Structures are given as C-alpha cells and as structure tokens.
C-alpha cells in the first residue's frame, strides 16, 4: 500500500471512529418492548432526523429515550427510562416519560362534584388522587394509528367510569420531530362532561440519563406567580407572586441555589423542594408561548419549552431514592432529574377560581407543547 492510500485509509477510519463516538452507546433492544398486555401488543418506535432521535413505546404512550447533541456534537440521552416493558411495570415511579391522564397532577381527597353528581376516584398519593389513578393512561396500551420516521399518532379510549371518571373519552396524541424540536399534540372528545388535564411526565437530565444531580442546571421559568400548596401538595386556591421567594425563576438561576431555604420556606418544606405549579405569563390564554429554559453548563445542552397550557409543574426529583435503575444501569438517585409538566392547574375541579378543565360533549380538547433542543458553544 502506497503512502497516499495509507493516509486515506487512516483518515477514513478516524472519521468512522469519530462518528461512532459522537453517539452514546445504544442500549435498547426492540424485543424487550414487544410483548402482549391483556391481548394488546406493545412495541418500540423510533422518530429521527438530523438533529434529534426519540424512542417511543405505546405502553403508556411514553418517551423512552431522547438523544440530542452537546456542545461537542456528542449525542446523549437526556430522558430517564428503562430497558424493557417489564422494567416500566415494576418501577417504583411508574410515570417515566408517559402520557398522564385522565387528569394530570392531584385531585384533593379523590373527589369532585360535576353537574350535581359527586365522583370518587382512587386514592393513590397519601389521601389524594394523583395522575389519573393507579391504572391511569400511563398504565394502558395505546393503539398506534399512524407512524413514520418523523411522527407517531396513538389513540386510547377511556371508558365511562374508568378510574371513577365520567364519560367515554377518546384521546389522541401525536409525537413529532421537526428539526431540533419534539412536539406533543393532544386531542380528546367525550360523550359526558368530564375533567381532562393531559401532560407528559418525562424526567430530564441534560447531562445524560441520571448523570449526577440536576441542581447545577440553570433554569428560567416564564412565570410571575405560582399556586402555593398545603401539606398534601393540594393548591390552597391562591395565586401567589414569586417576588422575593425561592420560586422566582424569571431570571435564570441554578435549580439548587435556594434549596437551602427548604427549612425556612414553608412551600419548599411542604414539597421537599420544588413540586409546584407555576402560572405562566401569557399574552392570551391558549396561545403558544415560551414557558421555560433549562441549560446544563457542563454539556452545553439547552432545552426550551413552549406551550398552549396556562401552567407548568416543576418537579425537582425530590422523591427519587435510587430504587429504580435506568436503561444504562444507573440508579435514579435523589434529584437526578427534573420534570416540567405543561398543564392546567392541580385540583381545578375543586377550585372555582382556576381555569376550567371540564370538557363537554361536542367540544374538542386540544393542546400542544414543544420541546426545543440546542447547545451553547
């Protein structure tokens, strides 16, 4: 082999090596997601373009993995998840990456009144109802009705009386990648008045799945107010200013900066840190607007969130304790991830001052949120 050929081969091998090392080692095996749950088939689907790569399963309509580049161009998985359907089913925290419904967040004492009737829901979070109950949408197999390289559409029919909720509710969700964005679009229709509050519960760590604490991440939330809570994390019914409080994220600060006030600040104390709904600043209700920005200074990864929803729950991983082990073999330790759940406010069916979450027959529930990924050089 002459010198020129040797140089070309060396350069080619170097290029191939560099391209391979620009992506985190892939650990998902599709057969671990292909199973049968009560006669319904589950599977794993890939959405991909030149910017981001997303893996979705129809079990819980959930995000399993999301890869985006850091400042060096190295693709890393920024969503916590598991290697198999079996691992999702046995996880201590059952909500990883899933679509939450019929009602995201908490409903006080699992009760609400609607059109003269009182409805009782399963209690699964101390004395309250959380995330649609133990067999909420996160625990259901969704039907895939369309899928291609850039999007997937899934549907689920929640029967009248399921988890105590009234009405047959037909839900549709579309996950789509466009450039460096992942969008989630929700639709729902009912044949009887019912509360509906859908969201996605992805747990993020922009350094990579469970790569240390998220307390050094920089966070900005476009919210001048939040909804304070009682000891059970049920809203008190007030809209409170974030001014001069640990809840002021209008200018970016590290997530952990004010956590030393957890003893002195009653709201941080009640949440064990941040687990609160923020009232987003919007020009008009229902408009698509900027909600939050998160930056990991070490990797340079940045995530911007836009939503049509009026609120967003910021959860700082306060209840993670290492019980769950993720797809890369890493324990999900205390504050190893955060969630930013676009939503209507918690307990709205019992809070007349909050924006209504009641969907009536003939109406269409429709909302969309966008997650935009970039990196700082």
What would you call each of these model-derived segments?
Residues 19-377:
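An exposed, glycine/acidic-rich loop-and-rim segment of catalytic or binding clefts
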Residues 1-25:
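Bacterial Sec-dependent N-terminal signal peptides
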């Amino acid at each position: 082999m002459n010198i020129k050929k040797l140089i070309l081969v060396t350069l080619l091998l170097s290029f191939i090596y560099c391209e391979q090392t620009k992506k985190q080692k892939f650990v998902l095996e599709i057969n671990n997601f292909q199973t049968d749950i009560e006669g319904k088939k589950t599977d794993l689907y890939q959405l991909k373009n030149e910017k981001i790569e997303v893996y979705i399963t129809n079990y819980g309509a959930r995000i399993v993995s999301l890869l985006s580049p850091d400042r060096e161009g190295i693709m890393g998985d920024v969503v916590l998840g598991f290697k198999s359907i079996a691992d999702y089913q046995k996880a201590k925290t059952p909500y990883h990456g899933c679509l939450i419904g019929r009602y995201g967040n908490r409903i006080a004492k699992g009760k609400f009144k609607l059109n003269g009737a009182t409805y009782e829901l399963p209690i699964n979070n101390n004395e309250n109802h959380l995330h649609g109950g133990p067999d909420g949408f996160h625990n259901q197999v969704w039907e895939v009705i369309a899928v291609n390289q850039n999007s997937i559409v899934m549907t689920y029919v929640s029967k009248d009386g399921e988890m105590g909720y009234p009405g047959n509710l037909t839900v549709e969700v579309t996950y789509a990648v466009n450039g460096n964005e992942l969008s989630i679009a929700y639709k729902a229709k009912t044949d009887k008045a019912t509360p509906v509050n859908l969201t996605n519960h992805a747990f993020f760590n922009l350094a990579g799945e469970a790569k240390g604490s998220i307390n050094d991440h920089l966070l900005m939330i476009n919210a001048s107010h939040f909804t304070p809570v009682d000891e059970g994390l049920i809203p008190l019914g007030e809209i409170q200013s974030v001014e001069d409080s640990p809840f002021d994220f209008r200018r970016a600060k590290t997530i952990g900066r004010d956590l030393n006030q957890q003893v002195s600040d009653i709201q941080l104390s009640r949440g064990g840190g941040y687990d609160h709904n923020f009232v987003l600043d919007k020009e008009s209700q229902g408009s698509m607007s900027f909600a939050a920005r998160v930056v990991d200074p070490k990797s340079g990864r940045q995530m911007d969130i836009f939503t049509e929803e009026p609120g967003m729950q910021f959860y700082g991983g306060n209840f993670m304790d290492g019980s769950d082990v993720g797809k890369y073999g890493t324990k999900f330790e205390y504050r190893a991830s955060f969630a930013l759940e676009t939503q209507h406010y918690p307990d709205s069916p019992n809070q007349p001052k909050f924006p209504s979450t009641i969907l009536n027959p003939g109406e269409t529930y429709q909302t969309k949120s966008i997650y935009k990924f970039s990196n700082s050089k």
